[in-house]
Structures are given as C-alpha cells and as structure tokens.
C-alpha cells in the first residue's frame, strides 16, 4: 500500500496496488425461471422491500433493470390492492 497525493485538497490518499477481482452480479430473479414476478406473490415481493415498506434499490438487491421495473410495478399494484402495506413499522 502506498500513499498518493490528492491534488484536490493537498492531502494523502491511500492507494492499493492490487487490483481486486470483481465478481459479476447475477440477477437473482433471472436464475429462478420458475418464479415469475406477480403482484399476488407476496413472499417474493417482501424480499425486495425494506422493513419500512420501501422498495430496495438495484444496487442492494442485485436485480437487473428490466426485473426491477417489473418488481416496482408489482409492488405498487399489491399496495393498491392492500396485499402488502405501504408502511410496516411505526416511525
């Protein structure tokens, strides 16, 4: 590990010489083809919502963009039909 000078604020920044191996993320919904995204599948939809009922972002779940849009639409439909709550915890 070596230190390199940062020209932005004249401070030293630690730089790691090793290049890390980044594993490519695989969409968890694309792997299971038998499980379809549906607004009636409450168990699946609850995996992609937070404790407070908010939809989790792609960077946390690892879902591809196409499936994330389908998930969002299914969660909105399930909320509208009162299958899942809008907010689960008291704030």
UniProtKB/Swiss-Prot annotation:
The keyword Nucleus does not apply. GO terms for cellular component: cytosolic small ribosomal subunit. Signal peptide: none annotated. Keywords: Ribonucleoprotein, Ribosomal protein, RNA-binding, rRNA-binding. Pfam families: Ribosomal_S18. GO terms for biological process: translation. GO terms for molecular function: small ribosomal subunit rRNA binding; structural constituent of ribosome. InterPro entries: Ribosomal_bS18, Ribosomal_bS18_CS, Ribosomal_bS18_sf. Binds as a heterodimer with protein bS6 to the central domain of the 16S rRNA, where it helps stabilize the platform of the 30S subunit. Part of the 30S ribosomal subunit. Forms a tight heterodimer with protein bS6. PANTHER family: 30S RIBOSOMAL PROTEIN S18, SMALL RIBOSOMAL SUBUNIT PROTEIN BS18M. Belongs to the bacterial ribosomal protein bS18 family. This is Small ribosomal subunit protein bS18. It comes from Wolbachia sp. subsp. Drosophila simulans (strain wRi). The gene is rpsR.
């Amino acid at each position: 590990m070596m230190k390199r000078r940062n020209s932005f604020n004249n401070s030293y920044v630690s730089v790691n010489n090793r290049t890390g191996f980044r594993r490519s993320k695989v969409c968890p919904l694309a792997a299971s083809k038998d499980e379809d995204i549906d607004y009636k599948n409450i168990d699946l939809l609850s995996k992609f919502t937070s404790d407070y009922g908010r939809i989790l972002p792609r960077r946390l779940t690892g879902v591809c963009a196409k499936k994330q849009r389908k998930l969002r639409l299914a969660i909105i439909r399930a909320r509208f039909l009162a299958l899942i709550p809008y907010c689960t915890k008291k704030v």
